[in-house]
Amino acid sequence: MVSPDNRPGTQGPSASAHAHDSRVPRKRPGSWDNNPSTAGNRAVKKRAVRACVSCRDRKVRCDVVNGGPPCTNCRLDDVDCVLKASNRGKHNPARYQARSRLSSNATAPRAPSPSDNINTDADTAAPGPAPGSASATVFRSDHSHGSVATGQPQERRGSQSVAHGDEETICDDDENENNSWHNQQEAEQTRIIHDSQVQPNDIVHETHCEQQPQPQPSQGAATRSTPSAQPANPQTSDYLVALAFQGFYALGWTEQDATEAPPSSSRMDNVSASANTPHADQNHLPLYISPHPSHLDKHDLEFLARKDCLTIPDNQLRDELIRIYVFVVYPFMPAIDLVDFLEPITGSSEVGTVSLLLFQAIMFASVTFIDMQLLQRYGFKNKRAARQVFFNRVKLLYSLGYEADRLTLVQSLLLMTYWYDSDSDEKHTWYWMGLALTTAHIEGLQRDLEEPQQMTKNGRLRRRIWWSCVIRDRLLGLGLRRPSRIQEDEFSVERLRLDDFDISLPPPPAVARLLAAPSYTGKDPVNRQRMANLCIDLSQLCFTIGRILHTQYTIASTPGAGSNYLRRAIVRPRSLKEQAHSFAKCDADLQEWFRSLAPESRYVPGARDGGAAAAQVENSTIRLHKILLYMKYLTAIGALHRPQVFYSGSDSIDPARKADSRRKLTEAAVAITKLAFDLQSNGQMCYAPTSSVPAFLSAALIHLLNIRSPDEETRNISIGRFCQCLDALHQLQSMYTAADEAVHIINNMTENAGFILPLLGIGNPMSKANGIAARNSRLFSAIGPSRVTTAYPSPAPATGNLDTSQEEMISAPIPGAGPTGVALTGQRSRQPSAGPNMTPSATPNLMSIWSAAGNIHSERDLPLPADLMAGIQLDLDAWYNIGDIIDPALMNFETGLDFLNS
């Protein structure tokens, strides 16, 4: 075989036109020397005009020009002979016009012709692709047939095809032009000058966000494009390229020329027009978004554009989503610096930018709580469809490694934990929480910084991010019945304090105008301090929740018999002996937490603050988070005392302790029902998080048990409370898949238990589907649509249908209340009613609904099971093996429903 160093080659046809270069490397002895040089007695020869990719990489001489492809080297080595387009001379024709016009004002520039890019050395030329594209052809050698196979062409820029019989080669374009390194430098300088000319506050590039949209930059939007993007306006491109190479004064640029330059809006009009097609350059981002990372190539960015990941909501939708995030999501997850995030968006700062991954994560976390009418204007059918679209953007950006900063990754992953679609989706809440904690540990957030750095801006942010991880981990463990990942002895970060929150200095005016609540985010720091205290109280509650999960529950060791759920359960209650030494301590910790709450952090039923419109907005927001904090406390009570009530093991439980746990569990269910009424009456149910679903389900199932009570008064009151919780779950169905599963659990249990509730379509001769439709039509027609249309919770309660005595009972403190803040229904006086005998404080809105429905006018109209009419006492421990049905249902929605029918 001929060695690579001695293989034949040919001299290029234009060898006489090239000057000798003293930098030509010395060739080995025995190599071909067609052009010897006398200088230094060194054998110097000219480079071949063309070389295939393989020979170029190996730095050996190629004879593809003489013999045609495949070359001798590729033929002997049996490799593909790939001819690649020359990187020289790939200039945009518009640049030639700019340089000609700016260097000589006497003559007009010549318009480029299609023949400018065709190599004059070619004998025969075939029509090639349009300017701006090219092909690289692969020639495969086939020794068995002695033929050459042509591979798939790959798109490139600025070359033409030349036909050679059945083979297609690529000819060089303008051999005398600058090389590719100069072209890259020109493109980079052009981008820098382009960015410097467009001010951040000129016009914001934006796109309308639809359910399956293509990114469409709005008219007149100033954007940042990738270096691969080609200017859409030739005149503007001429000026920018010439400016990058020669400068203002070298070009003789005058103020008159500047006035004749096209404005940025016209430039972006052309870009918008070209962005409507899937394959157009759609990589434009607003100036407040950080540039694309360098490791993503053109194909990655095109993929992200096709997948809608680069779509930025327009100003109206974006601002509303930001307000939702600040008022609803941020207070209990203060994992970002609000001012640093909002200043670039509002134009208050020209220095910072926002990570695209974090921006899209915030948009996703907020879209759940936005008004449905606004989403429908953008083409979304429901909130679930909007959640899917917004989450897909964040997931693809993360999967492609778009963001490299670990702090930003933790912030984004925490927001991604709001995603839960179904149990079949392996990448749901638990998965993203694990990634967030892993990244946080890699970044070292579990350890405090050194003393001088703790109180810096970055130190406070790191501490808030870590405690956001702790809070989220505890709440997910409580709601998903999973073991919490963070152990108390595995981190050394101090507890949150007010100094960790930026509450002293007011934000810039533009940020305050965006949030539209000056006293909440502006001059008066009192309300910001109250919100920070609520977050601190939640972090302290999560300490106790963590102890409950660690001491009262354990990893399931063996699958349960006959239950699909138990085969998949992660934790189950411990035995009574294991619980005994820690149960009393956890119960005391919960009561101590509740007693130590400051008065401004304590939820008072029916208490509402009035005042100016701005004060109503902020007070309503603070009240919303008081309700959510109280609901999490009640859910923790249920997780602690439920195993005591529904324990079915062989160990005997103290009757007094069991009775006390049953009382507290019922109190918690009653209190959660009142919270549901408060949220509905204020129009704030649309802001309830996913953690409210297990809370309402827990309360509904406790009321469902009390419906079978032999006491008529308790039974009728429990029906109203059950309806209130079920109605709340129905409202949450438009937001969360978990609410669907919770309603499904309740429907199966009521059918299996043989309940007959005509109002809810349960137990009627009609079909199940008709019963559900009848129930929904009656309930929701009486409630009517939500009054909330923006991010500002409505402070006005819907109490027009209540009389004075009912209002007093709602707002009056309950004497003798237990640790949950409410007393049992049987321990206080009630007012008689013509309908089902419910306390007005329990569900007064359901009374008006039932009255309007006209189905139930007296106690005799409600069909009841015969055993209850006979006064048979219900044994909670024996009813449908309640320990294996209700307890899993209250704690976990990641389960099938087959066990309900077993």
Curated annotation (Swiss-Prot):
SMART domains: Fungal_trans (SM00906), GAL4 (SM00066). It holds the Pfam family Fungal_trans. Residues 178-187, 220-234, 262-277, 826-839 have a biased composition (Polar residues). Disruption phenotype: Reduces significantly the induction of the FBD cluster gene FPSE_08120 in response to 2-aminophenol (2-AP) treatment. Residues 168-177 have a biased composition (Acidic residues). GO terms for biological process: DNA-templated transcription. Residues 120-137 have a biased composition (Low complexity). The keyword Repeat does not apply. Induction: Expression is induced in response to 2-benzoxasolinone (BOA) exposure. Expression is also induced in response to 6-methoxy-2-benzoxazolinone (MBOA) and 2-aminophenol (2-AP) treatment. InterPro entries: Fungal_Detox/Toxin_TFs (IPR052761), Transcription_factor_dom_fun (IPR007219), Zn2-C6_fun-type_DNA-bd_sf (IPR036864), Zn2Cys6_DnaBD (IPR001138). GO terms for molecular function: DNA binding; DNA-binding transcription factor activity, RNA polymerase II-specific; zinc ion binding. Keywords: Metal-binding, Nucleus, Zinc. CDD domains: fungal_TF_MHR (cd12148), GAL4 (cd00067). Its main location: nucleus. Residues 1-47, 92-189, 208-234, 258-277, 820-839 are annotated as: Disordered. It is found in: Nucleus. Transcription factor; part of the Fusarium detoxification of benzoxazolinone cluster involved in the degradation of benzoxazolinones produced by the host plant. Maize, wheat, and rye produce the 2 benzoxazinone phytoanticipins 2,4-dihy-droxy-7-methoxy-1,4-benzoxazin-3-one (DIMBOA) and 2,4-dihydroxy-1,4-benzoxazin-3-one (DIBOA) that, due to their inherent instability once released, spontaneously degrade to the more stable corresponding benzoxazolinones, 6-methoxy-2-benzoxazolinone (MBOA) and 2-benzoxazolinone (BOA), respectively. This is Transcription factor FPSE_08121. It comes from Fusarium pseudograminearum (strain CS3096).
